[in-house]
Amino acid sequence: MINRNANRDRDRSRSNDKELKINYRIKAREVRVIFENGIQEVLSIEDAIKKAKEAGLDLVEVSPNVSPPVCKIIDYGKYKFHQEKRQKEQKKNQKVIKLKEVRMQPKIDTHDLDFKSKNILSFLKDGNKVKVTIRFRGRELAHTYLGYDILNSILEKVGEVNYVLESAAKMEGKTMFLIVAPKFKK
């Protein structure tokens, strides 16, 4: 017989792991309680829940992996709201850096090279990393120095932007590449 709810049950258990245990869901016998004013005390779970109820607040397990587990007496709704707000703020401030790739061959014309250099420049100004790839075919492999010359000329043209050479020109099989990243101001 196939259990059709197995995936649903597994997903529920994952979401419950992220949830904090509050009040009677805490399974430990003793807990280290941090009160609103910052005072710490080791209490039995019953006493800790009683003190939380007297204050009109919740006993929230903050750090379950310590012995005894650390709990705070706080308003759970406010605590969860502030945590979600902090996560949204961190996500908003997080900068996503993409890796853009510009491909070419060693037989590239000067105008095409200028055009590709402008593209690389715009990618770097947007804050993206750029992987410049030169693909060699057939007899072109005997003239890899052309690839180094092309990559050096690109770096000279891109020199007006502050950049960091993340990996110097390397040959991997029939391709030569380098990775350039923008230098961020701190």
UniProtKB/Swiss-Prot annotation:
Disulfide pattern: none
Homology family: Belongs to the IF-3 family.
Cited function: IF-3 binds to the 30S ribosomal subunit and shifts the equilibrium between 70S ribosomes and their 50S and 30S subunits in favor of the free subunits, thus enhancing the availability of 30S subunits on which protein synthesis initiation begins.
Alphabetized InterPro entries for the sequence: T_IF-3_C_sf, T_IF-3_N_sf, Translation_initiation_fac3_CS, Translation_initiation_fac_3, Translation_initiation_fac_3_C, Translation_initiation_fac_3_N
Domain of life, source organism: Bacteria
Keywords: Cytoplasm, Initiation factor, Protein biosynthesis
Localization terms from the record: Cytoplasm
GO biological process, one term: ribosome disassembly
Major localization class: cytoplasm
Pfam families named among the record's database cross-references: IF3_C, IF3_N
GO cellular component: cytosol; membrane
Xref: Gene3D superfamilies: Translation initiation factor 3 (IF-3), C-terminal domain, Translation initiation factor 3 (IF-3), N-terminal domain
Protein name: Translation initiation factor IF-3
GO molecular function, one term: translation initiation factor activity
Subunit composition and interactions: Monomer.
